Amino acid sequence: MLANQANLIDNKRELEQHALVPYAQGKSIHQLFEEQAEAFPDRVAIVFENRRLSYQELNRKANQLARALLEKGVQTDSIVGVMMEKSIENVIAILAVLKAGGAYVPIDIEYPRDRIQYILQDSQTKIVLTQKSVSQLVHDVGYSGEVVVLDEEQLDARETANLHQPSKPTDLAYVIYTSGTTGKPKGTMLEHKGIANLQSFFQNSFGVTEQDRIGLFASMSFDASVWEMFMALLSGASLYILSKQTIHDFAAFEHYLSENELTIITLPPTYLTHLTPERITSLRIMITAGSASSAPLVNKWKDKLRYINAYGPTETSICATIWEAPSNQLSVQSVPIGKPIQNTHIYIVNEDLQLLPTGSEGELCIGGVGLARGYWNRPDLTAEKFVDNPFVPGEKMYRTGDLAKWLTDGTIEFLGRIDHQVKIRGHRIELGEIESVLLAHEHITEAVVIAREDQHAGQYLCAYYISQQEATPAQLRDYAAQKLPAYMLPSYFVKLDKMPLTPNDKIDRKALPEPDLTANQSQAAYHPPRTETESILVSIWQNVLGIEKIGIRDNFYSLGGDSIQAIQVVARLHSYQLKLETKDLLNYPTIEQVALFVKSTTRKSDQGIIAGNVPLTPIQKWFFGKNFTNTGHWNQSSVLYRPEGFDPKVIQSVMDKIIEHHDALRMVYQHENGNVVQHNRGLGGQLYDFFSYNLTAQPDVQQAIEAETQRLHSSMNLQEGPLVKVALFQTLHGDHLFLAIHHLVVDGISWRILFEDLATGYAQALAGQAISLPEKTDSFQSWSQWLQEYANEADLLSEIPYWESLESQAKNVSLPKDYEVTDCKQKSVRNMRIRLHPEETEQLLKHANQAYQTEINDLLLAALGLAFAEWSKLAQIVIHLEGHGREDIIEQANVARTVGWFTSQYPVLLDLKQTAPLSDYIKLTKENMRKIPRKGIGYDILKHVTLPENRGSLSFRVQPEVTFNYLGQFDADMRTELFTRSPYSGGNTLGADGKNNLSPESEVYTALNITGLIEGGELVLTFSYSSEQYREESIQQLSQSYQKHLLAIIAHCTEKKEVERTPSDFSVKGLQMEEMDDIFELLANTLR
């Protein structure tokens, strides 16, 4: 009975999917576009950054270029290369090629040169369309055909009418190159009819109309761009091209979609996981494609819009099946790939190409109008993959190599790959191609590449190899990077003595070992604590670093620790009546070593109420010396989220205690006799403002929150206070707590203290306990007073020769700029962000520093020097380095748990002349950083506090134009059991300079402000600049150069087998690097 029912289902399905749905069968892509241009001539067709074209304008420009191509010999099925940056011109070029009768081949300019060269040669393209900024690359790869540089073509005088060239739906439209098993990419040939069918499908299934605004997210070399481009342009809708900078910044991406009111977007699921539905309210359809989606991701989005999961290889005109998440179902448990789209046939077959019944696993094969013509110049592969369709005589069927099965509801479940092809971050990758590249290396005898899954269910590539001679992972990575695009590079390379085999003597891929992320690093066995002090340190390290198991011989740096977290360790020791200097932890980075420096202390910091005048610290004097416009609007802020909601009364009780506890938060600033006086008001008056808003009926929660937070930012009053603003936003899906504090009284470490106190106090209040916060350390007032004394002591004045030497070496050479404009305002500031992947960040934090015993700042600055050497062509550069400013310079002082603005600023000279070899430059940077006395804290004290007669010949003439600051793992401190970082990050977006929320009318205080922090396990670097001084392209070049050099440093350090020490690691004063190298070489020769 059940078998008969299954047969009925299968028969019904076959009948349904072979029914023809009408579409524009006799028309080509450009004809369908021309119909839209005629129907909607004045509607916006395409938008990129600040430029837009109407359908009429886009059509006319494409017609003009098409006529030029005809004169150059383009005709039916001619192959034309399109090698351009993502832009409006890119789309014009594609339409022009189609109108002239040709087929376009998109070539990604970021591909390795070998791959670009191969695609140009293999496709036999006689013409390449490009832009001036890319034209040199076309020539550099050895292309000898005709190059048409669109920027230089005189097209305006040409006829703008449609060409009406003869065309057929079976003409070639485009050739997409994808990964191939032979080690070379293969070109898939697609015809017009497949896209003509999609036009009808878009309108029938998605209801796409001229009212829609559709995003172009994908790279133009990826077939998803064809889907996005023609979904809009064949329906009269507007196409919005997303820049790489917007795509690489999740917050900017969300803002762009909302601000431009996009209605349809197609994204890889791996990208969508970083977005928040409430922040993109204009979307009506979300489509995921390129790799498998997940039930949690679907459930997160499906009730906010139409969620579509799409599947389809390049060989079938992009899309073969879709599945729409049911809106009437509370949650989904799995995500199938759905049912075939119109005029597309799906067959699940066995090895003999016989149909399998519902529930049986088999190979997924595809037929229908979207099928590709085959592979360019690969008749053998075409015959293998495009076989005669046994179910429809006279037609072909594409064998995908995917494993799938029909479900009883008529949908298809995707089960993975039969062969060794995978999809990672939306890219279909033939593992055999990577293996072939590795096997071409002269020292590699065997190579296997597989896709593995990390703890976050994300996929990565891992290469295993056997080599007869020494071939390190770093060497292989460099070699592969010259042959393969970035998305095909394995994340890890593992050397094996032999490959695991199955009983049939085939490589057992399932038995390949997981990569050791700490490969080539010394890994001591676990050593438990032996004393009470060691046990306390282990507990504190586990809490601060977020690591469950830590032994007493584990290295603080290797566990990802940095100087800011070292301060947190010191602060938490204070609650055990134990004292440790931060420098001791940094110098002796294992618990076994540093426990010897931990001392009991009976001295307790004053826990009473502080009031009265407080001397300005150096950084505060710097601030008032700048005479910024709107000094009241120079804040830092955060937004916290609690799904269960916050109790307003509890929040106020906790804030009352926090403001009472931390004296700096009660400051005001008066002008007396031409001077700024900092005054602590004690407990009198309004010490903070609290606001509560009920947004449960608000349709746009994000907009409401961001509007109010900006109002609060601009309402600070330095003279009268308060300088703390708190706002509670209650919504249907949890509450959001906004905290804004003027920068004069808070810094990055202060925020960590406040988050901890807020969590502690809130938990106590919820449990019905009295609020009792951890003890504070010495007051901000005491610290400032001690600095006044320290400023003229011999200990500090002994630093003067170092700073005098730096001034004498520094040449005041201006940073190159695109526009020589001064007095720029914050409203002109733009941000560009780059990110490292989590695995790259982990390598930087936990492994890279072991090679040369460096700190993270050493490596970040080494990369900065290499980037500026490449970008600026200067011989040297002086940067302003920002530090936390809580150095151990005053013996009796303990400010590890004190709130206030402690930041130090000091100049660092980077030599840009001798940047090779890489190992020497890393060591040189480290040694130069170690020579800076006391982490640079003394420089600003000398400048702003020391008596002029005690400053020697210091002139403080050095005026760096670049500021660099690494903030550490900031967002981890916002995650507690009670609250997390809010997805409404308007208040978290610290502002135009990458750190602070400043008045738009405030002056830009540095030409380039570079800020690094760890966010969501990723290193994020923000490059802030004024658009009145720099073009976006210039900063993009700098940021990309920085990322390239930083990754090279990480790779170099993590693959280094031996730890190499430098003079600063030893106590011999005056030892030079060259002398130490000689000593080590002598030792090595002696021991041979």
Swiss-Prot record:
This protein's encoding gene = tycA
- Residues modified as O-(pantetheine 4'-phosphoryl)serine are 563
Q: Which PROSITE patterns match?
A: AMP_BINDING, CARRIER, PHOSPHOPANTETHEINE
- Which Enzyme Commission numbers does its entry carry? 5.1.1.11
Please state what the annotation says regarding this protein's domains. Answer: One-module-bearing peptide synthase with a C-terminal epimerization domain. Each module incorporates one amino acid into the peptide product and can be further subdivided into domains responsible for substrate adenylation, thiolation, condensation (not for the initiation module), and epimerization (optional), and N methylation (optional).
- Cofactor: how bound: Binds 1 phosphopantetheine covalently.
The Carrier domain covers 528-602
| Pathway the protein takes part in | Antibiotic biosynthesis; tyrocidine biosynthesis
Q: Which cofactor does it need?
A: pantetheine 4'-phosphate
Which InterPro entries would you find in this protein's record? Answer: AA_adenyl_dom (IPR010071), ACP-like_sf (IPR036736), AMP-bd_C (IPR025110), AMP-bd_C_sf (IPR045851), AMP-binding (IPR020459), AMP-binding_CS (IPR020845), AMP-dep_synth/lig_dom (IPR000873), CAT-like_dom_sf (IPR023213)
Give the protein name, as stated in the record.
Tyrocidine synthase 1
What is the protein's quaternary organization?
Answer: Large multienzyme complex of TycA, TycB and TycC.
Residue stretches in coiled coil: none
